[in-house]
């Protein structure tokens, strides 16, 4: 019986010539045309046992592919060009791809030009980017490859600070490619992370490129009232879907987002004041009742800073309160601050440089009802008076933007809405052009370059140019609207001395 001799790494294997003749694959057709009898055909880059498996497939149309042998069989099938076996191997590898092997699969697919495996491994890296940074192979990704991965619209990062930590870890292994840092968008980063990068001697150039990472864009949470039940919905920029998170039957409450959880504070249920605070995780949709506030109150002013929820003032039955307290996320104890100088409800509170500013609202007792224009600032553990607002306002909505405060007033006793800017360093109020007039609730959010206002429609106000853009949007029955990013960066005053500790904490929090 005639046979063809193959030599693989010094080992000889004889193959019946009839198998070669019957083969439909180009590799074996070429052997039929050019093979010289008795001359061994040397096969390089192929495993002996993998070649045996391919011969079995040619004989019986069956092949035993496992996790342990799939790579060597695939290499042999690619070199010898047996498409059915290539497809079987690729399917096996894709089925078993995970965050611990996806970079190796990615490199393997590039080496042998396997597009399906390349796409699947790239998708796995994109979906598990924070986990794959622990892979020793992560630092071997090229600058262009990492740029492609981090520029993908669906890369699984939920804040630009996370992108920064991924880049810093890669730069540690690739110090000659520090300019990759320019793919960051500083306007989506915290000041703390920007300072840390600056202390490392890195400079982020101002980018005019569009933001491609959907996950770092603003999430939206909306509470809408319908038939006495309010429905909570959450919009994820990464998935581009709205999901129903849950319902609440409260009225006259306030709400805030902190660490991807929505806190619903105080208010009334069935016309009765409550002092409980409920929290729903916007990702898992799980509810938790946290420790009660110090008293029953509604129409409180709330703000968040450094992982803490602050509740200030409010209405205790018919009397305004000056109580100020905060709850740190993940803890169960409310911490009291000194009381406000002037008790109030329905005012606004906002943080600027770790100081709390409270403005406007109503001071009321059983005998008095006073609409306020005064402003208080909590700094160095005490409340101090600041320059009053230009007018008295019972309803105020305020937001910090670029180190100053922008305040929009509601309409009750007033005849129209007002827009003010409070210049913090000068303790000075100035009045700005107000584009619209709206009777009813409003919601104000800081969104990078602009301030978003939800009123009778959607408005974008650009402070630097003092311009407005109007968008048609149904706002009926909206009880709460907020845009937020998932900021969980440890907050501290980063210095050269504290920088290693800060980066270590960020790596543990973001990348493990």
Swiss-Prot record:
Look up keyword Secreted and say if it applies: no
Keywords, sorted A to Z: Kelch repeat, Repeat
From the UniProt record, list the Kelch repeat ranges. 216-261, 262-307, 309-354, 356-403, 405-449, 452-498
**Residues covered by the BACK domain:** 102-176
Q: Which domain of life, per UniProt?
A: Viruses
Q: Does the keyword Membrane apply?
A: no
> InterPro entries, per this entry?
BACK (IPR011705), BTB/POZ_dom (IPR000210), Kelch-typ_b-propeller (IPR015915), Kelch_1 (IPR006652), SKP1/BTB/POZ_sf (IPR011333)
SUPFAM superfamilies in UniProt:
Kelch motif, POZ domain
Q: Where is the BTB domain?
A: 2-67
Q: Name one Pfam family in it.
A: Kelch_1
Q: Name the family.
A: Belongs to the poxviruses Kelch family.
- According to UniProt, the name of this protein is Kelch repeat protein C2
Organism for this UniProt entry? Camelpox virus (strain CMS)
Q: What taxonomic lineage is listed for the species of origin? A: Viruses, Varidnaviria, Bamfordvirae, Nucleocytoviricota, Pokkesviricetes
């Amino acid at each position: 019986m005639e046979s063809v001799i193959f030599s693989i790494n010094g080992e000889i294997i004889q193959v019946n010539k009839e198998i070669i003749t019957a083969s439909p694959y180009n590799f074996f057709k070429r052997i039929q045309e050019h093979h010289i009898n008795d001359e061994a055909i040397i096969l390089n880059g192929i495993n002996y046992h993998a070649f045996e498996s391919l011969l079995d497939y040619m004989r019986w149309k069956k092949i035993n592919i496992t996790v342990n042998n799939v790579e060597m069989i695939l290499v042999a099938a690619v070199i010898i060009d047996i498409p059915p076996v290539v497809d079987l191997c690729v399917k096996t590898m894709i089925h078993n791809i995970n965050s611990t092997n996806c970079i190796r699969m990615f490199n393997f697919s590039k080496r042998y030009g396997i597009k399906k495996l390349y796409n699947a491994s790239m998708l796995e890296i994109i979906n598990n980017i924070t986990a794959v940074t622990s892979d020793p192979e992560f630092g071997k990704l090229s600058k262009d490859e990492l740029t492609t991965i981090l520029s993908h619209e669906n890369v699984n990062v939920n804040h630009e600070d996370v992108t920064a930590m991924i880049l810093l870890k890669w730069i540690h292994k690739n110090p000659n490619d520090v300019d990759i840092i320019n793919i960051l968008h500083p306007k989506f980063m915290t000041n703390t992370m920007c300072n840390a990068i600056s202390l490392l001697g890195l400079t982020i150039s101002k980018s005019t490129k569009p933001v491609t990472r959907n996950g770092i864009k603003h999430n939206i949470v909306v509470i809408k009232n319908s038939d006495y039940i309010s429905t909570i919905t959450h919009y994820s920029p990464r998935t581009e879907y709205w999901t129903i998170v849950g319902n609440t039957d409260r009225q006259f409450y306030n709400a805030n987002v902190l660490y991807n959880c929505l806190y619903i504070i105080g208010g009334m249920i069935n016309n009765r004041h409550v002092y409980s605070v409920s929290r729903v995780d916007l990702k898992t949709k799980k509810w938790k009742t946290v420790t009660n506030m110090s008293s029953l109150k509604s129409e409180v002013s709330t703000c968040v800073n450094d992982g803490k929820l602050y509740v200030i003032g409010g209405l205790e039955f018919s009397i305004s309160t000056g109580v100020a307290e905060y709850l740190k996320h993940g803890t169960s104890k409310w911490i009291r601050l000194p009381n406000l100088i002037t008790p109030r409800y329905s005012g606004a509170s906002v943080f600027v440089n770790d100081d709390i500013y409270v403005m406007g609202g109503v001071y009321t007792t059983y005998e008095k009802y006073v609409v306020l224009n005064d402003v208080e600032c909590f700094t160095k553990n005490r409340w101090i008076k600041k320059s009053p607002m230009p007018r008295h306002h019972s309803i105020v909505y305020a937001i910090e933007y670029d180190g100053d405060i922008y305040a929009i007033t509601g309409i009750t006793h007033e005849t129209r809405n007002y827009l003010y800017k409070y210049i913090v360093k000068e303790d000075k109020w100035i009045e700005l052009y107000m584009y619209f007039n709206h009777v009813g609730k409003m919601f104000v959010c800081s969104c990078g370059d602009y301030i978003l206002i939800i009123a009778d429609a959607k408005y974008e106000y650009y402070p630097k140019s003092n311009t407005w853009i109007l968008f048609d949007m149904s706002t009926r029955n909206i009880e709460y609207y907020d845009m937020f990013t998932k900021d969980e960066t440890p907050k501290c005053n980063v210095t050269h001395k504290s920088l290693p500790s800060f980066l270590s904490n960020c790596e543990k929090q973001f990348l493990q």
